[in-house]
Amino acid sequence: VRYNVIRWVSSAYPSYGAIGPSFANPRTGQILGSDITIEWYSGSSTPTMDELFSFKNEGASEAINAHFHNDGTACTLANELKSQFLMGTTFAEVNSEDPKTISRAHKEFLYYLVLHEMGHTLGLNHNMKSSQMLSPTDLHNTAITEKIGLIGSVMDYPAINLATDKTKQGNFYTTKPGPYDLWAIEFGYKEFDEKTEEAELQKILSRSTDPNLAFGNDADDMRSPGKAIDPRVMVNDLSSDAIGNAEERFKIVNSIMPKLKGKYSKNGESYAELRSRFNMLNGQRRNMAAVVSRYVGGVFIDRSFVGQNSTVKPFTPVSKVQQKRAIEVLNKY
């Protein structure tokens, strides 16, 4: 209770990634304390996970095992983020990028990981819709991203922000709480006079139709086939044009693949790192294909309340143009 800290650990279960558990007063729900733990593997640029480490261990804590059981409270961001980060560093390394740029990417990666877990310590839900906040043209505009962030909430599982033209590279990850985070924290933590509290809370809630405050948690995300219907509530995506962003990342992966063997094959050493990088990039292809495929047959959901005068219908099928575009991207890559 006295100290709330961030622990950097090297444990027997590196696959758990990172956690930000908290404990609360059972009578009031008030959060009394919390700690963030980051496993060295998740926070490092090391690409290889030793096969000796299983993804479930009877000796591991309940919190760690929750990560591998589709538990509603589980958070697998560290592993998702690590794969995205390795894609970015591999892209930089095969193109002989300035080490300072790679260092900046690593720093932003760690910032984001800690911010996400800190959000959990404050009681925030995952928000897998917030990565839709910015348009593709704004993603690398640091005048915007350093003011309000790359995404609406640090509680998302976003794709790394990579520019195909390195001279235009902006932030790789958001490094500050987004508009949704600030809004949710204001609702949950701001103190009001007892007489005005209800009216003030309703005033905060009335802003829910602001596009920058878009929300969709684990119950609505489409990471698993056959689950949910709104393709905007998805992991490993980025920007208001998730299809276009995925296509850009397909191009990046395809540009990396021919250079892998020359970069990561070393005389007298095993193929472990080459294999790991190759598998990681194929995993990214799978993620991008998943993002694009969700637009085929998808339905956009709007949960505005009666009286909010929303101009958006509760259910809007993804347009024929978008669905056709998604299929074309899948066929091409």
Positions of predicted regions on the chain:
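Metzincin-family zinc-dependent endopeptidase catalytic domain
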Residues: 1-121, 149-150, 160-163, 185
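Short linear motifs at secondary-structure transitions and domain/linker junctions
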Residues: 8-14, 129-133, 316
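Poly-acidic low-complexity segments
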Residues: 25, 39-41, 111, 127, ...
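Conserved catalytic/binding loops enriched for acidic/polar residues
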Residues: 93, 101, 105, 131-333
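Catalytic Zn2+-binding segment of zinc metalloproteases
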Residues: 118-134
